[in-house]
């Protein structure tokens, strides 16, 4: 027969002990989501221009920050960025690299966090297609991030020599604010896993996972990339492979989970990065034996 113990005023009931899973969940830091998505001008792999599919993929992602590439309004008369802003409720930051009388084409940044500073980085090289990057400082709310977050969203060129020059310019810009929590993301168009642009960026950011995002129906190439400084802020990286994402664009979105309120560590100095660049360049230029 069980005994019944009376509960007296002033008694404090002891909490039930946590299971190991509950304890791990309570100790885990909060996270937020960042994505990069080349939307191919809203044209799907079936050749149809359907912006609502892009909006649908963004709804699936539920990311807090999204870098977009190939955002186009020049040939359709349709303002893609305004449409996506209105459909999703994000703050929209344009970063056109081509501006003509009939519209614009280039990058964009969608964010739930208001920007406190935005500038454009010109990455154009010679007669190649104009390229650029959006360099935005976002004011994250308490509980998401301990300090302003710097986000650089870009789309690099198609030619190896072009990309090398563009990455050098990005490294110079990154070195202007050492120690600031930073995310660099976008379509880097780097087909070679050991190409110098990737090695330079991996050296600066202490590496990053590579995830295949192209082509969307059967991805084999990691053209879309994301790096974080400090490296410890990056929790996971994956491609978003929903049925809608496989048809809405020729790229899959790249989705990363970032730890909130990371410990800030000093980024490499510009001198250290320059030394690393020179060393990597010498190694790459040496003939194989």
Question: Predicted regions span which residues?
Answer:
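A short beta-strand-loop structural module common to alpha/beta enzyme folds
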Residues: 67-72
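Active-site regions of metal-assisted phosphoester/phosphodiester hydrolases
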Residues: 1-65, 76, 86-87, 91-95, ...
């Amino acid at each position: 027969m069980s005994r019944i113990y009376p509960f007296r005023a002033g008694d404090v009931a002891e909490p039930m002990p946590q299971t190991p899973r509950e304890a791990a969940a309570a100790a885990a830091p909060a996270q937020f989501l960042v994505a990069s998505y080349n939307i191919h001008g809203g044209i799907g792999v079936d050749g149809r221009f359907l912006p609502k599919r892009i909006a649908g993929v963004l709804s699936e992602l539920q990311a807090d920050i999204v870098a977009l590439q190939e955002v186009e309004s020049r040939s359709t008369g349709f303002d893609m960025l305004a449409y996506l802003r209105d459909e999703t409720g994000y703050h929209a930051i344009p970063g056109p690299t081509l501006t003509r009388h009939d519209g614009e084409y280039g990058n964009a940044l969608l964010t739930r966090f208001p920007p406190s500073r935005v500038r454009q980085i010109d990455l154009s090289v010679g007669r190649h297609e104009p390229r650029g990057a959006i360099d935005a400082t976002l004011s994250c709310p308490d509980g998401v991030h301990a300090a302003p977050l710097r986000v650089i969203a870009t789309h690099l060129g198609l030619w190896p020599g072009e990309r090398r020059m563009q990455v050098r310019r990005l490294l110079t810009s990154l070195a202007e604010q050492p120690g600031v929590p930073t995310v660099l993301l976008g379509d880097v168009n780097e087909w070679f896993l050991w190409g110098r642009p990737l090695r330079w960026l991996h050296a600066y950011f202490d590496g990053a996972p590579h995830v295949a995002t192209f082509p969307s129906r059967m991805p084999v190439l990691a053209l879309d990339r994301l790096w974080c400084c400090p490296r410890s802020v990056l929790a996971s990286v994956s491609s978003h492979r929903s049925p809608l994402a496989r048809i809405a664009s020729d790229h899959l979105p790249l989705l990363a989970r970032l730890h909130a309120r990371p410990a800030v560590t000093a980024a490499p100095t510009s001198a250290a990065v320059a030394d690393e660049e020179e060393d990597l360049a010498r190694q790459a230029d040496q003939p194989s034996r």
